[in-house]
Structures are given as structure tokens and as C-alpha cells.
């Protein structure tokens, strides 16, 4: 079971894992869901090169709080905080509520699954060999203190006629152990041969 299910959803409320959207709605659920989708797509489009890991949206009675986890927080904040103010205004226009935007820096981006998967996807789009990109990510992760890592690429690898999946795994990865802190992410690389899916599991040792 632990091998198949999404490791983050499987461990919710364990190891401080939480939902990416923290709010409750009754009648206006659809409207708030569309607002969340807009906020995520707008931030991802505006800060493509800021090393975004995750965006957490929390709603209180009269306040919407957005927390952006990034490996390059300075890119998001901008000169004298101008860029983040622009984001705040754009979101406030959409949700018609007071908005708070916080930026959290990631100290070790080499062991963040979302950043690893997006890095591999970017390299594949630049026609770097998929094996080289995967092995480099694995080495960096283990060097920075990751307990174990598994990386998978699926699609027309290297421009092959028949799509296939290749996996690389190093270190420990206890997917059945619920208290083990497992980070997981999925990303897509849009190459000239088609889409290549990249999946990354990282065992973070406390």
C-alpha cells in the first residue's frame, strides 16, 4: 500500500504534514476553489525562476494568508518589497478581501522533492541526458544529508519511439513507515518528443 499511495496524503497530520489549502467553506466552496487555483497559477507564472516549492493558502474570517516556500525568496520579494506588494494587490482584487503574503526560504533545496523534480524537468527541456540529470540530483541530495532518494522518468526518453519508465534509487526509503518523513513531488517536462513525467521521493532524516 505504501508503495502506491501518495506519500504526503498518506502521512497527513504526521511529521507536521498539512494540506496546501487550509480552510472550510459551505455554500461558496466552488468560488473559493477557483480563487485558490487562480492564486497558485498566478504565483507560479510570475515567479517561474524563483525555485518555488509549495504555496499554502489559509483563510480566516476576514483574512486570506498565502505562504510561499521558495529557494530564492529575494526574487519574490523584489527591490524594497515592490514585487510582493504587486502580488498582494492582484490577489486582493480577485478575492475582495484583505490579503497577507509571507515568503519562507528553503535552507536545503537539494533535498526538497518539488525543487528536485522541477530541476530535472528543466534540464530535460534543455536536452540534457535524462540519466545524467537524475544521477546528478541523487548525488546532490545524498551529499546534503538526505536519507534516501528515488527518481523516476516516464515517456519517450532520449527521443525513443516507444515510451518507457526508468528508475534510480539510492539510500533508504521506508514508504511503509508512517512516522518516516517522506517528501514527494511530480513534474512534467515538455520536450519536442512529447511530455516526460518526473517523480521524486526523498527520505528526510531529522
Curated annotation (Swiss-Prot):
Pfam families: KH_2, Ribosomal_S3_C. One of its GO terms (biological process) is translation. NCBIfam families: rpsC_bact. Belongs to the universal ribosomal protein uS3 family. GO terms for cellular component: cytosolic small ribosomal subunit. This is Small ribosomal subunit protein uS3. It comes from Wolbachia sp. subsp. Brugia malayi (strain TRS). Part of the 30S ribosomal subunit. Forms a tight complex with proteins S10 and S14. It comes from the Bacteria. GO terms for molecular function: mRNA binding; rRNA binding; structural constituent of ribosome. Keywords: Ribonucleoprotein, Ribosomal protein, RNA-binding, rRNA-binding. Binds the lower part of the 30S subunit head. Binds mRNA in the 70S ribosome, positioning it for translation. Gene3D superfamilies: 3.30.300.20, Ribosomal protein S3, C-terminal domain. Residues 39-107 form the KH type-2 domain. PANTHER family: 30S/40S RIBOSOMAL PROTEIN S3, SMALL RIBOSOMAL SUBUNIT PROTEIN US3C. PROSITE patterns: KH_TYPE_2, RIBOSOMAL_S3.
Amino acid at each position: 500500500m505504501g508503495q502506491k499511495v501518495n506519500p504526503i496524503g498518506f502521512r497527513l497530520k504526521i511529521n507536521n504534514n498539512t494540506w496546501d489549502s487550509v480552510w472550510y467553506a459551505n455554500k461558496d466552496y466552488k468560488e473559493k476553489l477557483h480563487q485558490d487555483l487562480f492564486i497558485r497559477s498566478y504565483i507560479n507564472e510570475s515567479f517561474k525562476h524563483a525555485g518555488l516549492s509549495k504555496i499554502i493558502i489559509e483563510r480566516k474570517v476576514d483574512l486570506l494568508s498565502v505562504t510561499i516556500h521558495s529557494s530564492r525568496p529575494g526574487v519574490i520579494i523584489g527591490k524594497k518589497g515592490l514585487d510582493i506588494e504587486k502580488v498582494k494587490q492582484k490577489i486582493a482584487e480577485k478575492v475582495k478581501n484583505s490579503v497577507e503574503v509571507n515568503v519562507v526560504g528553503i535552507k536545503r533545496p537539494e533535498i526538497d522533492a518539488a525543487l528536485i523534480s522541477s530541476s530535472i524537468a528543466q534540464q530535460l527541456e534543455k536536452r540534457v541526458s535524462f540519466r545524467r540529470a537524475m544521477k546528478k540530483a541523487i548525488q546532490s541530495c545524498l551529499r546534503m544529508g538526505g536519507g534516501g532518494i528515488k527518481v523516476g522518468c516516464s515517456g519517450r526518453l532520449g527521443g525513443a519511439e516507444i515510451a518507457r519508465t526508468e528508475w534510480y534509487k539510492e539510500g533508504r526509503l521506508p514508504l511503509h513507515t508512517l512516522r518516516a518523513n517522506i517528501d514527494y513531488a511530480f513534474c512534467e517536462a515538455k520536450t519536442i518528443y512529447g511530455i516526460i513525467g518526473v517523480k521524486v521521493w526523498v527520505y528526510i532524516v531529522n
